[in-house]
Regions:
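Substrate-binding N-lobe of the ribokinase-like
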Residues: 1-50, 54-58, 65-71
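Ribokinase/PfkB-type carbohydrate-kinase core domain
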Residues: 30-41, 55-173
């Protein structure tokens, strides 16, 4: 999100955390090389990693736990950015730990009322609950969802005929 926003001329920032390790340094260097602004804390946990495999073109993820981005904190700089944001993108995966969930929701609470709050639902493995989805939907005014995630939403919220209409809206966006 921030990469594309930055390339389109917006003042985008990545807010996250990395470990004080080689992967963390590599990420920061890559962000610098691509002129992407960021507020990234170095925390005493390893930088997050994900193993991705493809089965018939469909990705499967193994997302490591107890990593840096599970330990976000609501810094004053992040709150300052939120207070002047035109758009904020967040998802369920980033909220998998209680600490990061509280941080993301706190940061969102400082955004202006007219800011876009894009909930990129990102349903991965067991890192979401119906309650987390509901909380996040209430915080959002825009939803990014794929076909597979739409099926999960239908099951979670017992949508029947509405699913067809929702998928038509999604496909026309």
């Amino acid at each position: 999100f921030v990469y594309h926003a930055s390339r389109l001329g917006a003042e985008g920032y990545a807010i996250s955390a990395v470990g004080d390790d080689g992967l963390g340094r590599e990420i920061l260097e890559e962000l610098d090389n691509n002129s992407i602004r960021y507020l990234i804390e170095k925390v005493p946990y390893p930088t997050g990693t994900v193993q991705v495999t493809l089965q018939d073109g469909v990705p499967d993820y193994i997302i490591n736990e107890r990593v840096a981005w599970d330990h976000l904190s609501p810094t004053s700089n992040a709150i300052d950015l939120a207070e002047r944001a035109d758009a904020i993108c967040f998802g369920t995966l980033g909220q998998r730990s209680a600490q990061s969930r509280e941080t993301i929701q706190a940061i969102l609470s400082f955004a202006p009322d007219d800011a876009y709050r894009c909930f990129d639902i990102n349903l991965r493995q067991h890192y979401y609950t119906k309650e987390l989805i509901e909380e996040s939907l209430y915080l959002a005014n825009m939803l990014k969802v794929n076909d597979g995630e739409l099926v999960v939403l239908r099951i979670c919220f017992i949508w029947k005929e509405r699913t067809r209409r929702c998928s038509l809206v999604y496909r026309t966006l």
